Amino acid sequence: ITIIERAEGNYLIDSKGRKVIDGLSGLFAVNIGHGRKELADAAQAQTLQLDYFPLWSYAHPKAIELAERLISIAPSGMTRIFFTTGGGDAVESAWKIAKQYFKMTGKPLKTKVISRQTDYHGTSHGALSITGIAAFKQMFEPLVPSTFRIPNNNWYRAGSEFKTEDDFAIWAANRLEEAILFEGPDTVAAFF
């Protein structure tokens, strides 16, 4: 097994000193690079002041500051922020918010989720149900019902049957529309 000892910028360095590009950005969590001193300093300062506190019925200055910054760059009309602890938790929360919204607006049958083949959404039970990578899911099936997949929309995977990227984009959008119509527009809550 390869042992990764450290990282610098976009590189991982193994126990033999070999450098490789971190193509997954630390599983999508290190998208600005490893070993950033300014981030370590900010994390240390915040940890010494308030390392963790749940936001259930409470707030703290840094959460308020971040929420205000996000709202300032969000599309018009978006005025609320919901913080989660990570990617899979964010997916689970978004799915639950969609289901709750439709129940509260008199559409309780809108519970189904459509996602793309080969998409990765996390390893928690619900997020894994939406994930489109069969090898990740097989040992845990059956998973949450009411999840459906459509073809991936990456142009580089399209093959030669499409003359232009626009042709492929229209084809991919049509697959989503077909899935919604097949499952029933009154039953689909979200598309991931």
Language model: regions and residue ranges:
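Residue-level recognition of short loop/turn positions
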Residues: 15-16
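A residue-level signal for beta-strand positions that form part of recognition/binding surfaces
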Residues: 9, 20, 146-147
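Short, small/polar residue-rich loop motifs at catalytic or cofactor-binding pockets
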Residues: 4-8
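Short helix-terminating capping/connector loops at secondary-structure junctions
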Residues: 77, 105-110, 143, 185-187
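Glycine-rich loop-to-alpha-helix module at the N-terminal edge of alpha/beta enzyme cores
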Residues: 19-107, 114
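PLP-dependent aminotransferase-class I/II
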Residues: 117-192
